[in-house]
Amino acid sequence: MARSLIIAACGAGTVGREHFLAEYGRLADRLEREGIQVALDRFSALPSRRAFRDKDPHGFQEFLAQLREHPPRAKAQILRGVLLRRKTIFELEPQLKTLQVPTLILVGDQDEPCIEPALFMQRHIPHAGLLTLPRSGHQVNLEEPALFNLHVSEFLSAVETGRWGSRTEPRT
């Protein structure tokens, strides 16, 4: 059983679900027909990826180089088998309310698809706290590694020493 949870950049596809399903379904088809560069071009153009590209061009290129190594067919299967089939964060509300472990939720303020789901999780997980990193996108751990690791370390220390308690007032 987990003693704590760290949730980062989670929930894309929760808001605007129909658009998400259609867009990623098309991307899966294109990956199989045209190869991995299709995904790289799409990822590079997303507003939620811009912060990483602008902050650390070399790191962003390294990230793309690693993605380039992924087999396109496998990537398409992951899109269809996981992303397009998973429940939205909103649909997980009953399960979120039962989580009884300290939880740190991290999101970049430019990761628009994940902001509303992050707020939702923070409101429905009893022992959750939310950290929004400024001028950061979807890869908060890669864009701001020192800041990310500092907050994760502080969270784990608070959990270990019993300083991460529950909220005093229940949320709806």
PLM-predicted stretches and their roles:
Residues 2-38:
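Flexible "cap/lid" loop of the alpha/beta hydrolase fold
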Residues 6, 104-106, 131:
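Conserved hydrophobic packing residues within short motifs/helices of P-loop NTPase cores
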Residues 10, 108, 135:
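Cofactor-binding loop segments of dinucleotide-utilizing enzymes, especially the Rossmann-like FAD-
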Residues 42, 61-92:
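Hydrophobic, aromatic-rich cap/lid helix
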Residues 98-99, 105-107:
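Short beta-strand/loop motif that positions the catalytic acidic residue
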Residues 112-117:
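Conserved alpha/beta-hydrolase "acid-adjacent" motif
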Residues 127-172:
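Catalytic active-site module of serine/aspartate enzymes centered on a nucleophile-bearing elbow/loop
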